Structures are given as structure tokens and as C-alpha cells.
Regions:
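Polar interaction faces of repeat-based domains
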Residues: 20-24
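Surface-exposed interaction regions that form or flank ligand-binding interfaces
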Residues: 3-5, 17-19, 31-131
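Active-site ExK catalytic segment of metal-dependent nucleases
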Residues: 10-17
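Hydrophobic, well-structured mid-protein blocks that either form specific transmembrane helices
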Residues: 25-29
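Ordered hydrophobic segments in well-structured contexts
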Residues: 1, 8-10
Length: 131
């Protein structure tokens, strides 16, 4: 998770190697390895949204309503991601790879409502207590 003046960002990091395909609304995605072996795994975009919603709810209950966003990072070198969005939703969970990880930094630092300093301090205290 990343915490900055734009709120909290939950980052689901995956270390899969190969090509990831599917649709962002699918329950499972397909991973095709370089050997041709295929396996399915739970859609990390859905997984991270559940985590982000849980964190946002916990923060709101603690009296610190804070924007919480989520994203997915496939960190393994050479992993390619080919995901579609058949429903053309406006609020799609962003998916980043090692190659475009610098866009992830921009997403964390520049997307979302700017928090006041006291909100950031309160958020930090709550998160430290959650450890």
C-alpha cells in the first residue's frame, strides 16, 4: 500500500511470468507461460478492489473518510498483459507492468482528491494501529 497526499493506494503485486489475457470483468484470468502451459488465476483487479473497499470502510468507521484506490502491478520482467474491458467502464482498475511502472508512480501521486495534512496524519495513525 502507498500513502500520500492523494490518499491511499492498495497495490496488488503479482509475480507471474508469461502472457496474461482476459477481461477485467472476468472472475479468472489466463496466464500462458513461454512453455505453452496455461493456468487460470483469480482476477487481481477484482481482488484489489475488495481490499480497497475494505480499507475505505475501515477508515470511514475510524472517522477518516479518505479516498482509497486500487491497482495491479505485474512485476516480473517480460510479463505482458493483454486485458480487455468489454463493458467499457469508466472506473476500471488500472493494471501496470514492470515496463510501465513509472505510470504507476504517477497514478499514486497525482490521481485523487488532495488530503489536508491533518487527514494524512490521522490516516497514518490508523494504519499504524492496524499493523
Amino acid at each position: 500500500m502507498a500513502l500520500c497526499r492523494r490518499g491511499a493506494t492498495v497495490i496488488e503485486v503479482k509475480n507471474h511470468a508469461g502472457t496474461v489475457t482476459g477481461d477485467l470483468s472476468d472472475h479468472d484470468l489466463l496466464l500462458t507461460r513461454k512453455t505453452g502451459a496455461e493456468l487460470t488465476f483469480y482476477n487481481p483487479a477484482m481482488q484489489v478492489m475488495t481490499h480497497a473497499q475494505t480499507l475505505a470502510r475501515a477508515l470511514a468507521e475510524a472517522g477518516v473518510p479518505c479516498p482509497v484506490k486500487g491497482c495491479v502491478l505485474f512485476i516480473r520482467e517480460g510479463t505482458s498483459v493483454r486485458l480487455s474491458d468489454r463493458f467499457h467502464r469508466r472506473r476500471v482498475t488500472p493494471v501496470f507492468t514492470r515496463r510501465n511502472r513509472f505510470r504507476l508512480r504517477w497514478y499514486i501521486l497525482h490521481r485523487g482528491k488532495r488530503l489536508r495534512r491533518r487527514e494524512v496524519r490521522a490516516l497514518r495513525r490508523i494504519l499504524e494501529d492496524m499493523k
